[in-house]
A protein has these predicted regions:
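Polytopic transmembrane helical bundles with strong interfacial aromatic enrichment
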Residues: 1-138
Length: 138
């Protein structure tokens, strides 16, 4: 596995601690300890869920491209793009509803769309590189 990707994956595994801590934040929002309106509650849940799912997907993509024998450069690029989406998407959900009582998402919602584009790019790169590795092995 590409050493840079190995370092990125190690850092990613450590960030799961932060995602778990985010779960305790959601518990405090849910029981009313942290005040939040309905929009904030919905967006906080969406941000937390996307963080967990996209980190898991990014780790899976990294392992899958490596095991399939995909080009190390392309495999790394695809996996890192998926992991970047795991930053952009949740950040957009959380940061777009900051404030005492937002009624609609703020400008940081653009980060969700940037993350979605990054996710699609990473999945296409990874999918094509895994497919190419498979075809080369036939």
């Amino acid at each position: 596995m590409n050493p840079v990707l190995t370092i990125v994956l190690g850092i990613t595994l450590l960030t799961v601690v932060g995602i778990a801590f985010g779960g305790t934040f959601l518990l405090r929002v849910g029981n009313g300890t942290v005040p939040a309106n309905d929009l904030q509650k919905t967006f906080f849940r969406a941000g937390h869920a996307h963080a967990g799912v996209l980190v898991t997907l990014g780790l899976l993509v990294a392992v899958l491209t490596h095991v399939a024998g995909a080009s190390p450069g392309w495999g790394t690029a695809g996996a890192v793009a998926v992991l970047l989406a795991a930053i952009f998407v949740p950040a957009g959900f959380f940061l777009s509803v900051l404030g005492p009582d937002p009624q609609r998402p703020g400008p940081m919602i653009a980060s969700v769309w940037i993350g979605a584009a990054t996710l699609v790019a990473g999945l296409v790169i990874s999918g094509v590189s895994v497919l190419a590795a498979g075809l080369a092995a036939v």
